[in-house]
Structure formats: structure tokens, C-alpha cells
Amino acid sequence: MKTPAPGRIHSIVLVLLSLAVLQTSKAQKVQNDIDIYSLTVDSKVSSRFAHTVITSRVVNKADAVREATFQMELPKKAFITNFSMVIDGVTYPGNIKEKAAAQEQYSAAVARGESAGLVRATGRKTEQFQVSVSVAPAAKVTFELVYEELLARHLGAYELLLKVRPQQLVKHLQMDIHIFEPQGISFLETESTFMTNKLAEALTTSQNKTKAHVRFKPTLSQQQKYPEKQDTVIDGSFIVRYDVDRPLSGGSIQIENGYFVHYFAPDSLSTIPKNVIFVIDKSGSMMGRKIKQTREALIKILDDLSPHDQFDLISFSSEATTWKPLLVPASTENVNEAKSYATGIQAQGGTNINDAMLMAVQLLEKANQEELLPEGSITLIILLTDGDPTVGETNPLNIQKNVRKAINGQHSLFCLGFGFDVSYAFLEKMALENGGLARRIYEDSDSALQLQDFYQEVANPLMTSVAFEYPSNAVESVTQDTFRVFFKGSELVVAGKLREQSPDVLLAQIRGQLHRENITYMMMSHVAEQEEMFRSPKYIFHSFIERLWAYLTIQQLLEQMVSALDAEKQALEARALSLSLSYSFVTPLTSMVITKPEGQEQSQVAEKPVEDESRGSRVYLGPMRFGHSVGDRTSRKPGGGLKLLNGTPLFGPPGPPAAASPFHRMTSRLVLPELMSPLAPASAPSPTSGPGGASHDTDFRIKGTTPTALPFAPVQAPSVILPLPGQSVDRLCVDLRRPQELVNLLSDPDQGVEVTGHFETAKARFSWIEVTFENPQVQIHASPEHVVMTRNRRNSAYKWKETLYSVMPGLKVTMDKEGLLLLSRPDRVTIGLLFWDGPGKGLRLLLQNTDRFSSHVSGTLGQFYQDVLWGPLDTADDSKRTLKVQGRDYSATRELKLDYQESPPGKEISCWSVEL
């Protein structure tokens, strides 16, 4: 292929599953030149082990050479196993080599003046892969990337994450996710940040006892963001969550092709009491949002302590101080006192990690010596810091040595690194050396939730000193088979290789300690039966257990290398490298070299990134190219996307500005003549469909109302607008006025729903509204900052006006670009939440299908769905009347209000209003 002159090359970043798109001033034309005519994602999950294939087919429609860049995101724990490009019928594969050999080939290319174009960077949950190639006029290119990962169980669920961002309409776009779980699938749910009601028509899910198939295949019209435009609405994450049945307490053993995997997660055990010390950094670098979020999270965590637990707090800056001289029981009184203490923590001073950690160990040792630790309980230390040590002992190696010597294998240490100014490698090694783990807390609006989620992972220990044993005449080798603690909602995984002449039955023994007793499980698995089970399903990729064994072994070897000494570390590295090369995994020890057509840049190298010692992100850029396009002039921040340096950042193709919603959100059945205001002349009903003509599952629109824009009216939106179907008045405006903070808005035990709110009387607004469902057990907490959905102790945060589409058994949760959050269930009342920006701004509650409330509904708002008696109009003033609810009289006044179901600034409506 002839290489065009540099001056004639235009760059297009072709995004499949990507972070961002850089555009030149002719970006729209260039994007149209490079056409993605097919994009498929095929993910096969076989007993937690996911094998994902991304295939993209593109054609250059221009009459000149164009450069296309394949760019995608994959999960952090995944290993790339293959990449190839097919150009003009010729396949150009990626070859996995030892990193040193790949670097030598890369350096030689650099010496020839060629560039290495692969960019790899860590994000919060994903890593980025990128490779570019020049495409001749009318030529077609097929990109294919394969990666594998073991889905870990967190808080009772496995999660498969896919990023979908094509940045243009794709004629053939299809995702297929096949799941096979021999234990049986207990629940399955999907969630998307880009799904609309129109796109949801292209999503299908089928499921039986052991198999599930999720397919997403949208048409071109379903993908369109705007009519007659090429912009796509598909831009974000697609997530599948599920869990499996566990009929046997000893777990599940699965065998295929001479390898086995043992999954262990008993769920019927009682929680072991814990003694936990929270060590909180309050140095000057924590000032501002960090310390505020830390206080917020700590208060929530303290509320979650079990009455059987004991705890204490240590805060440190230049010096460390304890809240109490000894651990105290987590009684209501002590927890409330600790919350008051946490509220007063202020940031200032240096960072003395060494003294704080030694003080924590001394507290536990003192409690142990005085026999204050309950029998059978476990001890945890949780450290939160955002920076490197600056006061006292500042040498990280000495601190690690001091902490290791003090703990002496008696306690588990968990280290949380807040932001990117902390040495993550320092914290990780210190945690791994002491039976715990490290976690980075990303500095963002949901940092407090990240802290709470981490605590939930370790909040409920079920077993300690867990050991797996297999007969030596049956098993040749196994992965890690001893574990210090098993926590509720997680899973222990052991994989191994069987001997060639192994018995027909594989036996396993699992020993562990409960709160007050030891326990032993016995398992037996027939090899031939297991082999047959994995031989038949057509969509299961075979030899997956062998690859799972290799994957898990490599991950554990890399983890052991963190705390190993030189000689041991070299041996671990040699074994991990050998397995990486044998099974074609791109790991931190290997690189993939991408070959390309003659005449093009010959060396592109993919590396597996690791958390950097100081900034949490390793970016492998190679030399920067110049003269090709502005797309090369980029900067990067840790975990972030790409940003233009020479002008306005452009992400994605331009489109028309977001238009105001063409429809009202609430539905009322009737507007009575007595409610009509002279300021509100009759007008045509609102349209009955959303953008693009798509009808919505739940239609919050006002039909037949007569709103008029308010040029001067000093009216505001009420606290709540209640639709009253079947009553003589079709809606009621409610204003909360009485001094009250926590308000029980409505509760219906038959519907299994409760809505509460925190009302700030001084500001006349809700600071939060919370909706709790009994089945499924889901809680939605809405604040002006964001929406938090909690299920199985797992928190997910969403910003207002970010598209959300989550479907779980018995509940659908959606949010559109205007910020309307809908919670809908079959044959139940639909609840909406909205943060309204108009006059009287704040959180608002919306209700539909209120005729479905039962006769047992109650609460400040729920009472109006009992027997309500409306009195006649006041003879002296027809804008007043009385209504009687459950024997209590309320005065109602006909007033002008702003309808918050409209986009701000809202429309004026006439409404009967009551003050509570």
C-alpha cells in the first residue's frame, strides 16, 4: 500500500468503545468518510469467566487516504488475548512478547523515525486500547479485539461491563451476551447509561435455569439522536449483573479438560463480630471536599455497625489522637457520640501515618491483653489517607516494616488511598503484607459512596482461616487455597490442574472458623459428569477452565510480587511471564506488538498498565507525532479522556442544541371549568410522544390543561402536585409549611413502597427524598447533587440529567436527559423524582397511576388517597373551599402555581392548594 504524503492525511478517531473523539474543523466530513458499517460485541460468560470479542468493519468512502484509529475501553481486570486487522484480505496479527523484546522492537522503529501509537491509560473501572492504520480509498478494514476476565463477586452480584460509543450511526450494530452458569441463575438485571424507550425496543433478554441471552440490536432510526442527523444516542455503559443459586454450602466444583474450578460462597452463616479501628487522615491536604465527604461517609458507616461490634476512631495529621482510650461497643449511645466527633473533624497539619498506624495496633493489643475482645471476633484496621507521609517517620519502607512487625499477622489492614497524590504502591504493599487489600478512592462527587461501598464489602465477615484441601493423588497444582477472611457477598475461588491418572471422583474439604466453632464442608464431584456438562453447550468456548486457571494464577502471582523480596520476586515474575506467554495474555510483564502493512508505521505496542506509584496512571504514548492532525496535540489527566490543547474541546459530532421537552410530564384526567383561570386561555393539548415520536412507558403529561407562560407572576412551584383520579378535583397542590424535618410522605404496605423526605422549613424545600421498595429490596435516595440507588448494600450514584435505564425483576428505573427519574413496577403506582431548576427550585415528587394505591395507604401525602370529601365553594369567596380527610378539615384555596412538571421556568396553572 502506498503511503500518502503527510500533508494529505486527515485524522479520524474511530471510537468503538472509547473515551472521546478528537475532531478537526472538518471533523464531520472526515467522520462521514470513515464509515463503520458493522460493529458487533460478542461476550460469552462461562461459569463467571468472560470471553469478549469486539469486531468492527469500516470502509473509507473518501477519494483520498484516511487514518482510522480503533480505540476502546476494557475492564481493568481483563487481559487482552488477541488483536488483528484485516486489510485488503491480508490479516495483520498482534504478537504477544516479553516486554523487553517488544521494547527492543519498538525502540528500533523509533530510531527509524516511526511512531508507536498505542495509548494505554488506567481509569476508574476501565483501561484504554488504541491502534491506528491508514486506509486507502474504498478500502475496507476489519478490526478484532479479544479479551478475557474472571467476574468477581461484589456485594452479592457479578458484573459484566461494556462501553459502547460508536460516535456515528452503524448499519449493523449488535451486542450478544451469553451466560451459562451450571449452578443456576438466581437473578439477572441490565443497566445502561444511554438507553431510551425507543432503544429499549431493540433490547431482548431470555433466560432459563442455567442460561441467559441478552441481545441489543438497534436499527438506524432507533440509534438516531435527532431526525435527519447522523448523531447517535448510543454513548456510554451497558452492564449486566447477575448472581447464581447456591444449594450446597460447600460450593460448586466444575471440571473440564483436566482442570477444575471451585467456587465457595455460603450465604447462610451468621456474621462474626468485629473489632474495627478507623484511622482517618485529617492533614491539610484533606481540606475542602475531601474531609467533608470523609465525614459524610464515616457517619453513614458508623450507622451500619452491628451492635455486636466494637470500634474506635483515630484521626491524625502531624500527630495522632484517639477518640476513646479503649474500644467501645457499637451501642446507639456510642455510635451517636462517635458521629458527633466525626462531624467535628477538621483538616490541618502534616501527615504522620507511622504513629497513627502504631497507635491503632496498640489499641487492639491493649484490648486483647485486657480480654475485652469477644471470643471468636476478628480485628480490622481501616486506614484512609490522601498523601505521602510528611511528619515523623517518612520513609515508606520503614513504615511498612514497623506496621508489619506490630501487626504480626494478628489483624487485617485495609488501606484506602484518596485521590492521586498518594503513593498507591506504598499502601498496597502495606495492606497485602497484613492480610488486607488496598483500594483507590477517586476524588469525585461520589467519593463518600465509594468509601461506604468499600466498608460494606468488609462489614460482614462470615468465616476466618478458610482452607481448601484436595487429595494429592488427584490434584497436581492449585491456585491460592488459604484465605484469612471470607466476607458476605464475596466469593472464594480456587482453580487447579488434575493429574493425568486422577480418580473418577474429586473430593474437596473446606475448613474454617465461625464465631464460636470450627466448621468443615465435604464436597464430591464426578469428573466424567462434569466433563460432559461443558462439552454440549454450543456457545461455550471450550478449555475455559484451563484459561481461568492460568488467568487466576497470573493475577495472584502479580499480587504476591508486590510484597515479595528480590529472589522470591524473580521466581514469581518468571512463572507469571511464562504463563502469560503460554496463554497469550497481555499482562504487566508482556506486550503486544501490532504489525501493519509495509510502508506504514511498523511498531505499535500494547502494554498492560498498573497503578502508578504516585499518580495512579501509567500512560504509554511513545513519541508524539506532528504534522498529521490536531488530534495528536493532546494532554491527559489520570484516568481521563483526551482534550485539545489549541482550542475548544470537541467531543463527538456537533448537533443542534438540546431542545426543551415538547411534552408535559404529568397526566391528569380532567380539568374542571372551576379551575380555569382568566389568565389561562384554552390551548391545544400537549403532544403525546417524546422526541422522535417515541411513546413512553410512563407518560407524565398534562392533557387538556391550559398553561400560559408567566412574564411577571411572582408565583412558585408547590412542594408537591398530587393527581387525584376519581375525585371531584383532578389535582391538588400541597405546600409544606409546618416546622418538620423528616416527613413520612406516603406508605403503602400492600404496594410495598414507602416515600420519606427531609424538608428544610427555612428554605421551603426538600434536602432529600427517599423511596424504598420491599420487593425487590431497592432504595432510591435523591438529593440536589445526585441520585443514589442501593441494592444488596451496593450503591450506584447517578448525576441528574444523565440517561439511565435499569431493569431488574419487578422494577424499572429510568432517567432522561431532562432529569426525570421514573420508578415503575407492573400494576403499581409509578413514582417520579425531579430536581427542578425553576422558581422555588428543589426536589419534586411526581405520581402516576395513583388509583392503584391500596386502602392502607398513609402518610402526609398518602392520606389524600383515602376517602376525601370536598365541600362546596365558599359563597363569599369562590376561590376557597374545605376538604375533609380522615375526619380532619383542611382549607383549600384556588391559586396560581408553577407546574414543575414543565421544563423551567415552568407554566402557570390554576390549582386547589392546601398548606400542611
From Swiss-Prot:
UniProt induction comment: Levels of ITIH4 in serum increase 3- to 12-fold on inoculation with various bacteria which induce mastitis. Peak levels are reached around 42-72 hours after infection.
Source organism, top-level taxon: Eukaryota
SMART domains attached to this UniProt entry: VIT, VWA
Occurrences of domain VWFA (ranges): 275-458
Glycan attachment sites: 82, 208, 518, 683, 705-706, 708
GO cellular component entries: extracellular region
Domain VIT: 28-149
Keyword presence, Secreted: yes
Residue ranges with Low complexity bias: 678-689
Main location class: secreted
Family matches, as Pfam families: ITI_HC_C, VIT, VWA
Record-annotated disulphide pairs: 733-911
Subunit structure: Interacts (via C-terminus) with DNAJC1 (via SANT 2 domain).
Family label: Belongs to the ITIH family.
Protein function: Type II acute-phase protein (APP) involved in inflammatory responses to trauma. May also play a role in liver development or regeneration.
Name used for this protein in its record: Inter-alpha-trypsin inhibitor heavy chain H4
Biological source species: Bos taurus
